[in-house]
């Protein structure tokens, strides 16, 4: 059997774009025969779209759509691998069409959306064709749809931050709320909506800091509670200073305008996705270690 060298693994990886360890396994199975290893990988990984699916999609675009009567709307995140593709006209059109489909067809989840008719096929076949055309993995990550008797407003910042707001009041209020949310990124409408885990984490940090002060227990308790309340004011929409007038909170602004907000959705591209950084030397070392 031919020796499975790092150079051979590198060559196969460049030919197939498969992960380093998959290349090593294929070469081992093929006993060092590069052509056979390539065929093994193609069977394993399928066509170009399947092959691309192994790659991390941390870039992308936020799509938004609101019906003409502003009663129905949707926000969607579709990911790709690079910011360059996120600006591709075909990719942008695909994302915007999906936002419209979510609004009008009301799919329950991403799987249901993928099965919807689009063009001469489905959303999924269109996505697969786009992967083949562009050469990058594309994945529909998430969406949220709102239908209301009140009104909807939206704001997209650079295609990377998208906000959908359900509110009651003047149209200007809806626009202001959407822009404020994009700028400040609140976690919830009010304190009741902040995840308990987030509050617990903040309390833990505050307790550690307060304990280091050396103050009496009752003072420490007040310091901790003060820190938690400060945190809640910073991350809840209604308690935040309004971006267009920081002398009043968002709640005060709404009261002044005789308006209200029922719900908001905030999507940030790639939020929570760990971006993969390529270190070929490290991958070669890992492959070599696995061979030893």
From Swiss-Prot:
UniProt keywords, alphabetically: Cytoplasm, Elongation factor, Protein biosynthesis
GO molecular function, one term: translation elongation factor activity
Primary localization class, coarse: cytoplasm
Cellular location(s): Cytoplasm
UniProt KW Cytoplasm keyword: yes
Cited InterPro entries: EF-Ts_dimer_sf, Transl_elong_EFTs/EF1B, Transl_elong_EFTs/EF1B_dimer, Transl_elong_Ts_CS, UBA-like_sf
Disulfide bonds: none
Pfam families per record: EF_TS
Gene Ontology CC: one annotated term: cytoplasm
Superkingdom of origin: Bacteria
Region (Involved in Mg(2+) ion dislocation from EF-Tu): 82-85
HAMAP family: EF_Ts (MF_00050)
Function (record text): Associates with the EF-Tu.GDP complex and induces the exchange of GDP to GTP. It remains bound to the aminoacyl-tRNA.EF-Tu.GTP complex up to the GTP hydrolysis stage on the ribosome.
NCBIfam families xrefs: tsf
Family: Belongs to the EF-Ts family.
Cited PANTHER family: ELONGATION FACTOR TS (PTHR11741), ELONGATION FACTOR TS, MITOCHONDRIAL (PTHR11741:SF0)
Protein name, UniProt field: Elongation factor Ts
């Amino acid at each position: 059997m031919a020796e499975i060298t790092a150079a051979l693994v590198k060559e196969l990886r460049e030919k197939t774009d498969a992960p380093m360890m998959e290349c090593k396994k294929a070469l081992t199975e093929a006993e060092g025969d590069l052509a056979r290893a390539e065929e093994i990988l193609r069977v394993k990984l399928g066509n170009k779209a399947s092959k691309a699916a192994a790659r991390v999609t941390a870039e992308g675009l936020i799509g938004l759509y609101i019906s003409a009567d502003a009663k129905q709307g949707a926000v969607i995140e579709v990911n790709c691998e690079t910011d360059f593709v996120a600006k591709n006209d075909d990719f942008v059109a695909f994302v915007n069409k999906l936002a419209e489909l979510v609004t009008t067809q009301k799919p329950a989840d991403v799987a249901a959306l993928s099965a919807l008719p689009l063009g001469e096929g489905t959303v999924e076949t269109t996505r697969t064709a786009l992967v083949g055309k562009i050469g990058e993995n594309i994945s529909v990550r998430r969406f949220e749809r709102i239908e209301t008797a009140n009104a909807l407003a939206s704001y997209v910042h650079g295609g990377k931050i998208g906000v959908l707001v359900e509110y009651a009041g003047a149209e200007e209020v809806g626009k202001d709320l959407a822009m404020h949310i994009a700028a400040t990124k609140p976690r919830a409408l009010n304190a009741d909506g902040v995840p308990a885990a987030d509050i617990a984490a903040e309390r833990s940090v505050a307790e550690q800091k307060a304990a280091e002060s050396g103050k009496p227990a009752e003072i420490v308790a007040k310091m901790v509670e003060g820190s938690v309340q400060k945190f809640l004011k910073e991350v809840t929409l209604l308690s935040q200073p309004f971006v267009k007038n920081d002398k009043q909170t968002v709640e005060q602004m709404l009261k002044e305008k005789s308006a209200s907000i029922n719900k908001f959705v905030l999507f940030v591209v790639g939020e929570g996705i760990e971006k993969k950084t390529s270190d070929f030397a490290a991958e070669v070392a890992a492959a070599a270690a696995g061979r030893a």
